[in-house]
Curated annotation (Swiss-Prot):
Protein name per Swiss-Prot or TrEMBL: Endoglucanase 1
Matches recorded under PANTHER family: ENDO-1,4-BETA-GLUCANASE (PTHR22298)
The protein's Enzyme Commission number: 3.2.1.4
Keyword Glycoprotein: yes
GO terms for MF: cellulase activity
SUPFAM superfamilies associated with the record: Six-hairpin glycosidases (SSF48208)
Name of the top EC class for this enzyme: hydrolase
Reactions the enzyme catalyzes: Endohydrolysis of (1->4)-beta-D-glucosidic linkages in cellulose, lichenin and cereal beta-D-glucans
Gene of this entry: CEL1
Active site: D82 (nucleophile), H411, D462, E471
Keyword annotations of the record: Carbohydrate metabolism, Cellulose degradation, Fruit ripening, Glycoprotein, Glycosidase, Hydrolase, Polysaccharide degradation, Signal
InterPro entries found in the cross-reference section: 6-hairpin_glycosidase_sf, 6hp_glycosidase-like_sf, Glyco_hydro_9, Glyco_hydro_9_Asp/Glu_AS, Glyco_hydro_9_His_AS
Entry-listed glycosylation sites: N254, N359
């Protein structure tokens, strides 16, 4: 929920009262899952680890990142199971962590400080990347092909730590606008707890968005094989420009951003119907975000975004005239074979966020002759979250360290190799592959990691080398944090 809006909180809790039951032994422990979903980010940290680091099998890493280029790029997150820092997915992760805290932070009082710490670990890095060199944004540390040819702990890595940036000559509107969105969203989160930091975030977001908008182009074109096929901007940069402007408007309340949205929306994707929300494609997320302005503030020019949000919602609801989503026999939303759970967590978050907006305005989604209520959206989101946490045909939790049965062979270098505490001597590049292909479980539990997940028949191979199913990623976890906060406060039933 929008924690700055007591009315929104009241409406959402009022709707949930008819759905809440007393907790029993059969209830999933959403509070435990919430805590672990945030803890996961400590396993992805790059840089000098703090004294309160809880995943103690990790150590310091990447302490000279950027130094050979005379910039400080220490910190941030490794994106997944490797030792690379990719700017586009890291910025999206940051935006989604921030959005989750904005909407649902007041429902996780015991975890909100940990959530803010996870967010700040990323924003501190993004601030460095945004301000190190004028008219430039640093968007990557590490050479992907060299990194992937090794199986090394981040504490040992000796592969090239090349640094890549976008600039006025080699633009990257997609990654820059996403970075602006991340910084703007985070500025809302820190508005009450650290006003000077919040101001710095917003000021930087404004500058980065100006850079993204003025020097247009895709970072995939500028950087080529450095980012492709790993994190190509397949959707282009229009979606990020509209997304970034939307977040800057929400964070700053500056009317110029609403003017930008109204003047440029149609050319930047406002009329598109799209059915996936991810680190690459922000169109659906933007529509949900802007629908708030119509539903709660009655900004008529934003009604279009509510209409397209309804189209997205209707595509997910079986029985509606425009239903087109694919679900596995066990009920999991299925979008693709590689890291499918990234789409499940982002969809669950959007369902709950839109339910919040509908509740606060007394609205509903229109699917032809069918009316879809906030309660319907909450129910569908719960099915997806519960599937991830173990209510599925395999009776397996896809969150590492949660529940009685979860994957043991996670595609993650640091987790699969002996920790530096146990094996302080370096394990070289090629020597590490014996651990990739070994049969014992990972020696270090990457608590809270959500993996890529099962296939379209609910089948999962607990195989460390099957990265499509067994690799975690920050952008899989980030949307789930807000969703788990909601269900921890509201263990709703059908």
């Amino acid at each position: 929920m929008d924690c700055s809006s007591p009315l929104s909180l009241f409406h959402l809790l009022l709707v949930c009262t008819v759905m809440v039951k007393c907790c029993s032994a059969s209830d999933l422990h959403y509070s435990d899952a919430l805590e672990k979903s945030i803890l996961f980010f400590e396993g992805q940290r790059s840089g000098k680890l703090p004294t309160n680091q809880r995943l103690t099998w990790r150590g310091d890493s990447g302490l000279s990142d950027g130094s050979s280029y005379h910039v400080d790029l220490v910190g941030g997150y490794y994106d997944a199971g490797d030792n690379l820092k990719f700017g586009l997915p890291m910025a999206f992760t940051t935006t989604m962590l921030a959005w989750g805290i904005i909407e649902f932070g007041c429902l996780m009082p015991e975890q909100v400080e940990n959530a803010r710490a996870a967010l700040r670990w990323s924003t501190d890095y993004l601030l460095k990347a945004s301000t190190a060199t004028s008219n430039s944004l640093y968007v990557q540390v590490g050479e992907p092909n060299a990194d992937h040819r090794c199986w090394e702990r981040p504490e040992d890595m000796d592969t090239p730590r090349n640094v890549y940036k976008v600039s006025t000559q080699n633009p990257g509107s997609d990654v820059a606008a996403e970075t602006a969105a991340a910084l703007a969203a985070a500025s809302i989160v820190f508005g009450d707890s650290d006003s000077s930091y919040s101001t710095k975030l917003l000021h930087t977001a404004v500058k980065v968005f100006e850079f993204a908008d003025q020097y247009r182009g895709s970072y995939s074109d500028s950087l080529g094989s450095v980012v492709c096929p790993f994190y190509c901007s397949y959707s282009g940069y229009n979606d990020e420009l509209l997304w970034g402007a939307s977040w800057l408007h929400r964070a700053s309340q500056n009317a110029s951003y609403m003017t930008y949205i109204q003047s440029n929306g149609h050319t930047l994707g406002a009329d598109d119907d799209d059915y996936s929300f991810s680190w690459d494609d922000k169109r659906v997320g933007t529509k949900v975000l802007l629908s708030k302005g119509f539903l709660q503030d009655r900004i008529e020019e934003l009604q279009l975004y509510k209409v397209h949000t309804d189209n997205y919602i209707c595509s997910l609801i079986p029985g509606t005239s425009s239903f087109q989503a694919q679900y596995t026999p066990g009920g999991l939303l299925y979008k693709g074979s590689a890291s499918n759970l990234q789409y499940v967590t982002s969809t669950a978050f959007l369902l709950l966020t839109y339910a919040n907006y509908l509740n606060s305005s007394g609205g509903h989604a229109s699917c032809g002759t069918t009316t879809v209520t906030a309660k319907n959206l909450i129910s569908l989101a719960k099915k997806q979250v519960d599937y991830i946490l173990g209510q599925n045909p395999a009776k397996m939790s896809y969150m590492v360290g949660f529940g009685e049965r979860y994957p043991q062979h996670v595609h993650h270098r640091g987790s699969s190799l002996p920790s530096v505490q146990v094996h302080p001597n370096s394990i070289p590049c090629n020597a590490g592959f014996q651990y990739l292909y070994s049969s014992p479980p990972n020696p270090n539990i990457l608590v809270g990691a959500i993996l890529g997940g099962p296939d379209n028949r609910d089948s999962f191979s607990d195989d460390r080398n099957n990265y499509q199913q067994s690799e975690p990623a920050t952008y899989i976890n980030a949307p789930l944090v807000g969703a788990l906060a909601f269900f921890a406060a509201n263990p709703v039933t059908e």
